[in-house]
């Protein structure tokens, strides 16, 4: 039996997991799972206490994407029935921010489909973010695709705090998921974001026929990229996508993955993201002993659980919602 608490203390002392130790976490016997999570919580609590960060997505532009990502219902190769619309207007983005403020959401995430944003779309986001900051004081994360340096600079100047661009999978597995852009394209966008002074957010999707070695490589790559926030998605296979029917995950393995990302990225915000409800199922609360952040509400094209259920879960766990909008901000009608 591995001593997971000892390993956790070593991590807190600066130890970086070896590949052997990382794979052992993913291969942790189910009867040791609670001990593994105890170690993960020891690390989590050292940096984040019992606080949980809440995030909410607005799908600002849906469908119409030319990329061929195998997991995505909005891609060019998907036949899934999804709503398609161009970038929403500023007023729609503001209404979403007002709802996020009411729900004590810490980070409001503006997400748009497509390979990358047009300058006109950047104009819309920039205008909205300036007013969101003035009225609500929320942290804003943008996720608009592959970004040019001048676009990143404009977002930073407008007040965007964070930019999300996921690596999604390992470098070696990436060509099995999409061929319309490269893994290096994604990494370059994360580097562009960092150079602009934006906080980098980059994560993964688990359950896309990758190996455990791939999962370890993902966690290590994100450590090397120094992503401040790491969303861990679990594949919600959608009919009409190339990965439809893929069902490799169970709740216990998902918890081991979350623990791995905590042990390998101890100081970072680890977020349980898409697919939480369908893959963790009744074990969702245990995930927050490793992670310290969740999405509330719906995702891009799939539904989340009722918001009230998430707030009840946090109350039952005894966790505190981290919500600190800028003190000068206030809702104006």
UniProtKB/Swiss-Prot annotation:
SUPFAM superfamilies: Radical SAM enzymes
InterPro entries in UniProt: Aldolase_TIM, BATS_dom, Biotin_synth/BioAB, Biotin_synthase, Elp3/MiaA/NifB-like_rSAM, rSAM
GO biological process, one term: biotin biosynthetic process
Pathway per the UniProt entry: Cofactor biosynthesis; biotin biosynthesis; biotin from 7,8-diaminononanoate: step 2/2
GO molecular function, one term: 4 iron, 4 sulfur cluster binding
Keyword entries, A-Z: 2Fe-2S, 4Fe-4S, Biotin biosynthesis, Iron, Iron-sulfur, Metal-binding, S-adenosyl-L-methionine, Transferase
Cofactor annotation: [4Fe-4S] cluster; [2Fe-2S] cluster
Catalytic reaction annotation: (4R,5S)-dethiobiotin + (sulfur carrier)-SH + 2 reduced [2Fe-2S]-[ferredoxin] + 2 S-adenosyl-L-methionine = (sulfur carrier)-H + biotin + 2 5'-deoxyadenosine + 2 L-methionine + 2 oxidized [2Fe-2S]-[ferredoxin]
Top EC category: transferase
Radical SAM core domain span: 47-273
Residues engaged in binding [2Fe-2S] cluster: 109, 141, 201, 271
EC number(s) stated in the UniProt entry for this protein: 2.8.1.6
Co-factor binding details: Binds 1 [4Fe-4S] cluster. The cluster is coordinated with 3 cysteines and an exchangeable S-adenosyl-L-methionine. Binds 1 [2Fe-2S] cluster. The cluster is coordinated with 3 cysteines and 1 arginine.
Binding site for [4Fe-4S] cluster: 65, 69, 72
Transcription recorded as keyword: no
One protein family per Pfam: BATS
Subunit structure: Homodimer.
PANTHER family registered for this protein in UniProt: BIOTIN SYNTHASE (PTHR22976), BIOTIN SYNTHASE, MITOCHONDRIAL (PTHR22976:SF2)
Family: Belongs to the radical SAM superfamily. Biotin synthase family.
Function: Catalyzes the conversion of dethiobiotin (DTB) to biotin by the insertion of a sulfur atom into dethiobiotin via a radical-based mechanism.
Protein name stated in the entry: Biotin synthase
């Amino acid at each position: 039996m591995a001593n997971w608490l000892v390993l956790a203390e070593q991590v807190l002392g600066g130890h970086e997991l070896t590949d052997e130790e990382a794979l052992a976490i993913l291969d942790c016997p189910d009867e040791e799972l609670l001990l593994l999570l105890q170690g993960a919580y020891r690390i989590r609590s050292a940096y984040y206490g019992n606080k949980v960060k809440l995030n909410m997505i607005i799908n600002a532009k849906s469908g119409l994407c030319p990329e061929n990502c195998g997991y995505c219902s909005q891609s060019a190769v998907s036949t899934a029935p999804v709503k398609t619309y161009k970038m929403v207007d500023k007023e729609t983005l503001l209404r979403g921010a007002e709802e996020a403020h009411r729900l004590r959401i810490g980070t409001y995430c503006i997400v748009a489909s497509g390979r990358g944003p047009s300058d006109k779309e950047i104009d819309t986001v920039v205008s909205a973010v300036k007013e969101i900051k003035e009225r609500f004081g929320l942290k804003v994360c943008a996720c608009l695709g592959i970004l040019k340096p001048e676009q990143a600079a404009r977002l930073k100047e407008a007040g965007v705090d964070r930019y999300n661009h996921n690596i999604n999978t390992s470098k070696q597995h990436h060509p099995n998921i999409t061929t319309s852009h490269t893994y290096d394209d994604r990494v370059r966008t994360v580097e562009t974001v960092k150079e602009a002074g934006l906080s980098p957010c980059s994560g993964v999707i688990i359950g896309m026929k990758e190996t455990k070695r791939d999962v370890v490589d993902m966690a290590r790559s994100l450590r090397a990229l120094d992503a401040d926030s790491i969303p861990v998605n679990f594949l919600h296979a959608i009919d009409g996508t190339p990965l439809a029917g893929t069902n490799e995950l169970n709740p216990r393995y998902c918890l081991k993955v979350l623990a791995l990302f905590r042990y390998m990225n101890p100081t970072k915000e680890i977020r349980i993201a898409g697919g939480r409800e369908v893959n963790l199922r009744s074990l969702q609360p245990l995930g927050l002993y490793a992670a310290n952040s969740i999405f509330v509400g719906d995702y891009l094209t799939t539904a989340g659980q009722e918001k009230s259920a998430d707030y009840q879960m946090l109350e039952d766990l005894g966790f505190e919602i981290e919500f600190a909008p800028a003190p000068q901000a206030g809702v104006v009608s």
